[in-house]
Amino acid sequence: MTLSGSGSASDMSGQTVLSADDADIDVVGEGDEALDKDSECESTAGHTDEVGELGGKEIPRSPSGSGTEAEGKGESQQQQQEGIQNKPKNSLVKPPYSYIALITMSILQSPQKKLTLSGICEFISNRFPYYREKFPAWQNSIRHNLSLNDCFVKIPREPGNPGKGNYWTLDPQSEDMFDNGSFLRRRKRFKRQQQDSLREQTALMMQSFGAYSLASPYGRHYGLHPAAYTHPAALQYPYIPPVGHMLPPAVPLLPSSELTRKAFSSQLSPSLQLQLSSLSSTAASIIKSEPSSRPSFSIENIIGVSAASSAAPHTFLRPPVTVQSALMSHQPLALSRSTAAIGPILSVPTNLISGQFLPTAAAAVAKWPAQ
């Protein structure tokens, strides 16, 4: 009993021990399971950490490779674009020459040393690509430089040479316009000097047409002057046609006596008055030297002369030799620059002129026999 009891007790204790062991085992098992769970968690966490590390390493690698490839592609595209842009930039560089230099180049390279506007533009376009690509914009500049600079001379086109536009050439005096033959440097602006012969011809033309120029700055004086210009027509032809219809009236309307006194005493110089008096005496001597048998007048004229002499002793008819012919045939007499100067003299009645300058003509006429 004791043994059994002890055995039972031992069994019980053993059972209890076993149960305790079992309990301990169970506890250990639970701990192992917890450890296993912890190890599994740690392994999963480590695996996830490794995967995270691997993923973190792989993720930056993939974009880094694509970025380098993109950068390489971008650089290649930029280089291609720069290469494409560099080609036209090199051809669009504006030449360092002025328009005058370009025109001079084109004229000098031509065989005839003259070109039209179209020929000049064609040479510049073929020589310089910049102007070839911008052709219509600079053509007016070439035209303005041709017309505004004295170094370029316009040559009209010959009648038998068909075409359009005039020729342009260089002035011979503008050869040294550029410094040492370099078209990059121009010494100074060339100005054409007017020749002396052209100036003399212009002055002669102004003197010739000065009498008919109403807008002349020097004005126009009617009458005779001591130092006046002798018209060539007065020396070649004995008779000058009247020009009264071309000129306005120069002498105011006055009585005949006042007109005679003022027109000749004020406008004629003393030397001319002496010459006219000598002409009157010469005319009187010519009339006296003519033969008396020459039939110069009719009966009606003689009767008219006698009546006029009785009414006005100082007025007579015109003698055979007129004052106009004497004035025109006398060479030393200085006339005005045109026929307008003798207009007042021709407008005076002839009987007044003969009465003043030929007082002895009445006696000569009275001696002629009537027929």
UniProtKB/Swiss-Prot annotation:
Initially located within the dorsal blastopore lip (Spemann organizer) at the mid-gastrula stage. As expression fades in the neuroectoderm, expression begins in the head mesoderm in two regions at the lateral borders of the presumptive neural plate. These regions correspond to neural crest cells originating from the mesencephalon (anterior) and the rhombencephalon (posterior; rhombomeres 2, 4 and 6). Subsequently expressed within trunk premigratory neural crest cells. It is found in: Nucleus. One of its GO terms (cellular component) is nucleus. SMART domains: FH. SUPFAM superfamilies: Winged helix' DNA-binding domain (SSF46785). Residues 297-303 are annotated as: tle4-binding. Residues 1-18 have a biased composition (Polar residues). Residues 1-90 are annotated as: Disordered. Induction: By dorsal wnt signaling. Inhibited by bmp signaling. Residues 75-85 have a biased composition (Low complexity). Its main location: nucleus. GO terms for biological process: anatomical structure morphogenesis; cell differentiation; mesoderm formation; negative regulation of DNA-templated transcription; negative regulation of neurogenesis; nervous system development; neural crest cell fate commitment; positive regulation of neurogenesis. Residues 94-188 bind DNA. Interacts with tle4. PANTHER family: FORKHEAD BOX PROTEIN, FORKHEAD BOX PROTEIN D4-LIKE 1. This is Forkhead box protein D3-A. It comes from Xenopus laevis (African clawed frog).
